[in-house]
Regions:
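Blade/loop signatures of beta-propeller domains
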Residues: 29-79, 238-248, 395-400, 478-480, ...
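Electrostatic cytochrome c docking/interface patches
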Residues: 38, 599-623, 718-722
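Repeat-blade elements of multi-bladed beta-propeller folds
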Residues: 51-55, 91-111, 137-163, 188-211, ...
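Extracytoplasmic beta-rich repeat domains
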Residues: 83-95, 125-149, 174-194, 233-271, ...
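C-terminal capping alpha-helices of c-type cytochrome domains
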Residues: 158, 616, 657, 677-717
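Blade-level signature of beta-propeller repeat domains, shared across WD40, Kelch, NHL, RCC1
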Residues: 557-602
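Sequence/structural segment immediately N-terminal to covalent heme-attachment motifs in c-type
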Residues: 614-635, 657-665, 720-722
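Gly/Gly-Pro-rich "capping" loops immediately C-terminal to redox-active cysteine motifs
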Residues: 633-668, 675
Length: 722
């Protein structure tokens, strides 16, 4: 070898060694996202300050061993930094992931941000350029995303238009991009859940079950290449065609009618949990579609695998076992809520279990090895649809007096569930689950057309729920008993005894998830815009932070970098508050302030003088609630529930004149308002406008009659926020 060249190589090697040795950030910046299976498994003991996966680690207990912020120091907590990564036209539902001092977080349109976890300074962002027209597929409002996965140097995100993307954790550059949609006879869908990554694979499901012709499945992709490793379907397809795998032949025996023409639902839109001890992936399966089983599966049975927890082998994709929480789902009672893995003493021995509080109101403790049901006790008194779970059969006993097919009525829980996706926190030492739930009733009835003709037609675009809508629904409600009162609670629940160590009422019916810590604290962002910190011993509030937005349907987590513990949550805006999409991070002695935005008053502008007929308004009522309400809200929805798309009652004359260009022509598609040219005709659009104008006139009349009370409430709100 040339001597000079050898000396040069040697000199450069020493120089590189010097740089790496005395500049720790050098290695970190070139090795971001270094998350492996072994690291995640060991993280509870070796790095409790990290938050490496959606649920903190593979067990997804979301319980932190950090103690710097505790019952003695909580009064020193303050806002450390903020970062606006979205706006009020999206929902911020993601859980930040923190790896080696970098926070990875997503906004509603699936944009990934890598931030310095101590300052909020942006390192990079990746925009997947989601097709904004995908908003038409959403069941539940504007664009939202529950977070990313970080694994082996990559960041993975499921996009709102149905793709799975891998991004280089160092640079933010795209590595691969795959479309998760199977086009054969199935409609497109959204992805809103966070992917999970483990055992060399990335796992993702999908949502949009209510949009018609949707059939749930989970796909495992090779983490390096994006190639499909296996796919597990959750609802059987056409029995006249070959089944994709043996489990579908089993499932098809439990369905009736021509379910495959509807799709069936069963999407895995949220919870996927990897268990390295049993080499399994637990899938939380969603509701049936349409909702009423009399429409979806007449003469059927359990309709597997709707509303179930399914365990599959991560190597083969074949099923180990399943447990169905709501056989023959009839109420939109998904089992897609978060699951936690734990260990409990049961029958004198330690059992490895999966724990879940799904929508239906019962809390389930299931053996992870074989799917044996160990406990199924109610976590709420607000259960009408069933009396109890029979432990001999493992099945809920449906209440014979609560049959909405023959008698439309209010039923608890509502389709939103007693507990929805908002994260829980499991203290494995104490055997307590901390979570928020609410008792809310919804009015259930069959679709008017189905009642009259026995036929139900799936909408190609818009929601296909199968229940009564519009004027028909309102007429039934007027004839029914009054709606039961709603109430929300947060508590510490013992799933073995079925009792609460403590439980407290909440001011808002809609709130965020929780995280508990070994410091004796429970952090809970509430729908009122308050981050409440409670004593885990008794649930008493020790500290509150009042934000200018709302924490409805969001999450919270905690992490440590260096010698400082942090708490992070996501703030949403709404129609009344022109602010949203903001990460809020707190630490001891944090001293920054978040600016208070101006409250936007909902004043009805000058209205068109069109004269619409009763029939046209009624048609518009049905069309509006089928095509518009999931984003713009049902008429009368209050601002505090964070429906953030514009209130159409407040359209000015110019917008009325441009409505055809907007809705049919797609002139605002880039702003998130898709075109409906293939769904809504010009005459139907005019009927929708007729309904909106009629509702705007009613609102304007109400405002004029109650002006003094409205001004007083606005002044009080301003004082509370000052």
């Amino acid at each position: 070898m040339n001597c000079y060249r050898f000396k040069t190589i040697l000199t450069n090697a020493f120089l590189l060694f010097f740089i790496i040795s005395f500049n720790p950030s050098f290695g970190a910046e070139n090795n971001r996202g270094n998350v492996t299976d072994e690291r995640v498994i060991n993280s509870p003991a070796e790095e409790p300050g990290s938050w490496l996966t959606y649920g903190q680690n593979f067990k997804e207990q979301r319980f932190s061993e950090l103690t710097q912020i505790n019952t003695d120091t909580i009064d020193q907590l303050g806002l450390a930094w903020t970062k606006q990564i979205g706006d009020y036209n999206m929902r911020m539902q993601g859980t930040p992931i923190v790896v080696d001092g970098v926070m990875y977080v997503t906004n509603g349109w699936s944009v990934i941000y890598a931030l310095d976890a101590t300052t909020g300074e942006e390192i990079w962002n990746y925009d997947p350029e989601v097709d904004k027209s995908s908003i038409r597929l959403a069941c539940c409002g504007p664009a939202h995303n529950r977070g990313a996965a970080v694994y082996e140097g990559k960041v993975f995100v499921g996009t709102f238009d149905g793709r799975l993307i891998a991004v280089d954790a160092n640079t933010g550059q795209e590595v691969w991009d795959v479309d998760t949609w199977i086009p054969e006879g199935l409609g497109r869908f959204n992805i809103t859940g966070a992917p999970r990554a483990a055992a060399g694979k990335v796992y993702i499901g999908q949502g949009s079950g209510e949009s018609g012709h949707r059939r749930g499945y989970v796909t495992a992709y090779d983490a390096n290449t994006g190639e499909v490793d296996w796919r597990f379907f959750l609802v059987p397809g056409d029995p006249n065609q070959p089944f994709e795998h043996p489990e579908m032949e089993l499932a098809a025996q439990t369905w009736g009618g021509e379910w495959w023409k509807y799709g069936g639902g069963g999407t895995a839109w949220n919870s996927l949990v990897y268990d390295e001890e049993f080499n399994s992936l637990y899938i939380g399966v969603g509701n049936g579609a349409p909702w009423p089983r009399e429409i979806r599966s007449p003469g059927g049975g359990d309709d597997l695998f709707l509303s179930a927890i399914v365990s599959v082998d991560v190597d083969t994709g074949r099923m180990n076992w399943y447990y169905q929480t709501t056989p023959g789902d009839n109420w939109d009672y998904s089992s897609a809520m978060d699951m936690a893995l734990g260990e409990i003493e049961f029958g004198g021995e330690q059992r490895k279990v999966v724990l879940q509080a799904p929508k239906n109101g019962f809390f389930y403790v299931i053996d992870r090895e074989d799917g044996e049901l160990l406990r199924a006790l109610p976590y709420t008194e607000g259960i009408d649809w069933a009396t109890h779970v029979d432990m001999e059969t493992g099945r809920p006993v449906e209440n014979p007096d609560v049959v909405y097919e023959s008698e439309p009525q209010w039923i608890m829980p509502a389709n939103s569930g007693a507990h929805n996706w908002e994260p829980q926190s499991w203290d494995n030492e104490l055997g307590l689950m901390y979570f928020y739930y609410h008792d809310i009733a919804n009015f259930y009835s069959l679709d008017e057309g189905f009642v009259e003709t026995g036929e139900y037609e799936i909408r190609e675009r818009g929601l296909s729920l199968g229940w009564g809508e519009g004027e028909y629904r309102r007429r039934l409600i007027e004839e029914a008993d009054p709606r039961p009162e709603s109430q929300a609670y947060v508590g510490a629940f013992d799933p073995i005894t079925g009792g609460y160590k403590w439980r407290h009422e909440l001011e808002s019916d809609y709130n965020g998830g929780v995280v508990a810590t070994r410091g004796g604290l429970l952090f809970h962002p509430e729908g009122t815009g308050e981050l409440s910190v409670r004593d885990t011993e008794n649930g008493e509030v020790l500290w509150r932070y009042k934000a200018p937005g709302t924490f409805r349907s969001t999450s919270v987590m905690t992490y440590q970098v260096g010698n400082s513990q942090y708490v992070a949550t996501m703030m949403n805006g709404n129609r009344a508050i022109d602010l949203g999409g903001t990460v809020l991070v707190f630490k001891l002695n944090g001293d920054i302030e978040l600016p208070i935005p101006e409250i936007v008053q909902a004043e009805v502008p000058e209205l068109p003088d069109d004269d619409f007929g009763v029939a046209q308004i009624s048609e518009g009522d049905d069309l509006y609630h089928a095509q518009c309400a999931s984003c713009h809200g049902g008429i009368g929805i209050p601002n505090e529930v964070a429906i953030v798309a514009p209130d159409l009652r407040l359209m000015n004359l110019n917008t009325h004149s441009e409505m055809a260009d907007i809705v049919i022509g797609g002139s605002r598609a880039e702003r998130g308002m898709p075109e409906f040219e293939d769904t809504i005709t010009p005459s139907q659009l005019e009927s929708i406008r007729a309904f909106v104008v009629e509702q705007a006139r009613r609102l304007k009349e109400f405002q004029e009659q109650n002006q003094e009370a409205i001004e007083s409430a606005a002044n009080e709100e301003a004082l509370n926020r000052a």
